[in-house]
Amino acid sequence: MTDDIGNRPCEISWFSALCDDDYEFLGQPDPMLQSSWEHCRNIVLTAQKGGFDNILLPSGYQLGMDTTIFAAAIAPYVDRMRLLWAVRVGEDWPPQLARRIATLDRILGGRLAVNIISSDLPGQSLESEPRYARTVEAMKILKTMLSGEHLSHKGEFYDLEIDPPRMKTMSGKCPPLYFGGLSPAAREAAAEAADVYLMWPDTMDKVRDVVADMRARAAKRGRKLKFGYRAHVIVRETEDEARAYAAR
């Protein structure tokens, strides 16, 4: 993934298993690896020591730890690596979220990125298309307020006339917004307001098609996207050992 903030052409990231998603065997939960402060903190610190550029702090309502609390707690331990903080926008009021983003970015010295999740409010359910439309409104509100601009927004989901919070990010702008989703509504949302479009493992031809499609959608809006790719990696001393482990 191309990184605008640093001089490296590619950002190499890891993730901390806040959603009880640290498995020895993919998709098979292990009670010994459930999320806890100690376990997830150690993942973050090991990733930083190993030279990773960024680390995802995922978020889910039912599983694991609260991502906002964990991000604030781990931030003082992180002195080089960026945090990719997952935010469930269906659970947040955008002006208050803008203030939290600015505060956490300050604590991190400007090393914050935000993974936008188009979530429901727990206990409620919204159809996919309006949920993504609400997410687009939220992303645009965040970008306006975190750029220090007065917000005058009248949308389907938010009707706001408000000044930005006094707390500013280190850059005076909104941190990069990462966003993933393959449905047409999700792709439109990413093209409209995200900065980095996240993808999942697939064949090279299919990934190439997705990238071309997303570039075209963004270009229609006079925008450009960067791209991220998530993959599960099995590392051993030799390729034969890695393949043998993968076949278990």
Q: Where in the sequence are the language-model features?
A:
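Conserved, mostly hydrophobic/aromatic
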Residues: A47, G51, I74, L104, ...
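Short, conserved secondary-structure transition motifs
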Residues: Y229-R243
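Acidic (Asp/Glu)-rich catalytic clusters
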Residues: G6, L45-K49, A71-R80, I101-L112, ...
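Flexible, glycine-rich active-site loops centered on histidine and acidic residues
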Residues: I5-L33, D92-H153, F157, P201-R215, ...
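N-terminal beta1-alpha1-beta2 module of alpha/beta enzyme domains
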Residues: M1-V78, K154, G172-P175
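Acidic-and-aromatic substrate-binding clefts and catalytic sites of carbohydrate-active enzymes
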Residues: P58-D66, G90-P95, T203-D209, I234-E237
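Active-site mouth loops of central-metabolism enzymes
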Residues: D22-E38, A86-P95, M170-L182, V233-R236
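Hydrophobic faces of well-ordered beta-strands that scaffold small-molecule active sites
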Residues: C10-S16, I55-L57, R82-V87, L112-I116, ...
